[in-house]
């Protein structure tokens, strides 16, 4: 495991959380790249035969993925998990217009947890589908994150994700400057090393 430590620079989570909280209201206006990546990931997910009861969206942000989950899976339990409380508040506000109808029909099945994805306060083997789109780059310890995800996944569950690699540094720097008022980005782990980490943590 020591040989599989990720190459990210240590992230000051407190500073990043403040930045995302500040950007919550306008995040959707600028996150074009992230939205396209999520659409591509949904295309891949739609080809996989799985009927999850519990879906966990790690780094859910403003809840943009909720409609995609609802389109593929009907009446399932969706958990939005993010370390920015204001991002989650924004996600809740998108759902509020439908809460009355959802409660009436018994379909109000979205919950929200504010926390760090490196520390998942979720029951073991509960989650059938763990989704993470454009968020793993905010982890300081990918090995720890993958181990935590493996522990909460149900037997036969699916972990599907996308993350940024070294070649996306230029694009992400421009996005960070607009959204977070910061043009610095991390050095990202390449997919070969991420693959090794996944295997080391029991994924197949």
Tell what function each PLM region has.
Residues 1-26, 35:
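N-terminal, positively charged/glycine-rich alpha-helical extensions of SAM-dependent methyltransferases
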Residues 33-52, 68:
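Conserved alpha-helix/loop element of class I SAM-dependent methyltransferases that forms part
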Residues 42, 70, 146-150:
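A structural alpha-helix within SAM-dependent methyltransferase catalytic domains
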Residues 54-120:
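Class I SAM-dependent methyltransferase SAM/SAH-binding core
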Residues 118-130:
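A short acidic, Gly/Pro-enriched loop at the edge of an enzyme's catalytic core
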Residues 128-143:
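A short SAM/SAH-binding and catalytic strip from SAM-dependent methyltransferases
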Residues 143-158:
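A short glycine-rich, Lys/Arg-flanked "PGG" loop and its adjoining helix->strand segment in the class I
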Residues 158-204:
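Conserved catalytic/acceptor-binding region of the Class I
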